[in-house]
Regions:
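Extracellular/periplasmic carbohydrate-active domains that bind, remodel
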Residues: 1-394
Length: 394
């Protein structure tokens, strides 16, 4: 798989660039595993380099803890909420590999509802983990009913996820039992990642961009950079996020031309930039461009520096947040209001831009922004509801 550049529109600010497009593997794979029509049960298994996994039937996770392999803790995580200690291997696991394609019209089912009855901590397995790999393509398949985050590239480079489906039940569905933290795609300490033309319906963030947690993440020091998330259709879920685990740093991320559809009830924020007290790291050069969210039940746009945490931070443990752009950003029905920008007093946000940002609410058309705190600089052009710039003191 190689990368080819392209000429984007003018960048949203001087230091921003769009990632290049990855192309299919240029080296012919030497192995192919075909899953024909029918149902096939398995515990977690590995894919090695130069392999195609072609799925026509359905791969099911076996419902047995005894037969499921465990793998070591992740070196960039050490907090209680971020998978400490041994964890269960992903159903489909690629590790230390290159030139892998997963394709086909079939289904990979993680039996998430069963797993959630056995354990509620974050040792539950992903459906697919791309771990320290290069040149990986996932296309066509449906990943369904994950026990935890559905698809996770971590410590990887040159990953292309396109034209596939993720169907993970959110906790209110009831059939099957919803699974908390059933994110769609989590890009973690990885570079050169393209996520495009997918349908994602899940029980947490549709797509989020991460880079390790707390002291372990800062010490591991592997940023996520050069990520594009574009032309996706989003069903139920919690929107397009950066964070909250960004201790290794996140930069150069574009979310563009994505649509949260109106035919399902959506919950959570549309765009959510979130950090935790004492995690540190940085979030730089993030752009939300030409996105439409047809219904969100909380904030349409939310920068939140105290996500699930409280207290004070230091210069090292306050996350740096700068150069965040929301342009041509529309929320047709933000039922709980347009949102807020709440930054650290100890380390204010720098260069926040909102341009052609419009939100409305069917439940309270007069409701304004929730607040704006500690924004050192920014630009606000054609924003409704009005009043955000004044709240920010700019």
């Amino acid at each position: 798989m190689r990368l080819v550049g392209f000429a984007p529109d003018p960048p949203p600010h001087p230091h921003f660039h769009l990632p290049p497009y990855p192309l299919p593997p240029s080296k012919k794979p030497s192995h192919q595993l075909n899953v024909p029509s029918g149902d096939f049960k398995t515990a977690g298994f590995n894919l090695t380099s130069n392999t195609i996994l072609s799925v026509t039937g359905t791969i099911w996770s076996v419902q047995s803890l005894d037969n499921w392999p465990k793998v070591a803790a992740l070196p960039s995580y050490d907090s209680p909420g971020a998978m400490p200690g041994a964890r269960y291997q992903a159903l489909v696991w690629f590790i230390n590999a290159t030139n892998i394609t997963v394709s086909g019209s079939g289904v990979i089912n993680g039996a998430g509802s069963w797993w959630y009855t056995k354990m509620t901590n974050n040792a539950r397995p992903h459906i697919m983990e791309i771990h320290n790999c290069t040149d990986v393509q996932v296309t066509g398949v449906t990943l369904q009913n994950s026990a935890f985050w559905t698809l996770r590239p971590i410590y990887s480079r040159n990953v292309w996820i396109h034209d596939m489906k993720i169907l993970a039940p959110w906790p209110g569905t009831g059939e099957p039992m919803g699974v908390l933290n059933s994110d769609g795609i989590d890009v973690d300490s990885s570079q050169d990642v393209m996520i495009e033309r997918n349908y994602i319906s899940c029980g947490d963030d549709h797509v989020t961009v991460l880079a390790g947690a707390a002291e372990a993440g800062r010490a591991f020091n592997m940023p996520t950079r050069n990520v594009t998330v574009q032309d996706n259709i989003l069903g139920t879920g919690m929107g397009l996020s950066v964070g909250s685990s960004v201790s290794g740093g996140v930069q150069d991320v574009v979310f563009q031309r994505n649509t949260m559809s109106e035919d399902v009830w959506a919950w959570g924020a549309g765009a959510h930039v979130k950090t935790r007290i004492e995690y540190g790291g940085f979030i730089r050069n993030i752009a939300y461009l030409d996105n439409i969210f047809k219904q969100v039940s909380t904030a349409g746009l939310w920068i939140e520096t105290g996500y699930q945490s409280s207290g004070n931070c230091t210069a090292e443990t306050c996350t740096e947040i700068r150069d965040i752009v929301f342009r041509n950003f529309t929320v047709l029905d933000a039922t709980s209001g347009p949102g807020s920008i709440l930054c650290y007093a100890e380390r204010p946000c720098v260069n926040i831009t909102l341009e052609n940002v419009h939100m409305s609410s069917s439940t309270d058309p007069t409701r304004g922004w929730g607040g704006c705190e500690h924004v050192a600089s920014g630009t606000f052009i054609d924003v409704t509801p009005a009043g955000l710039q004044q709240m920010c003191g700019l």
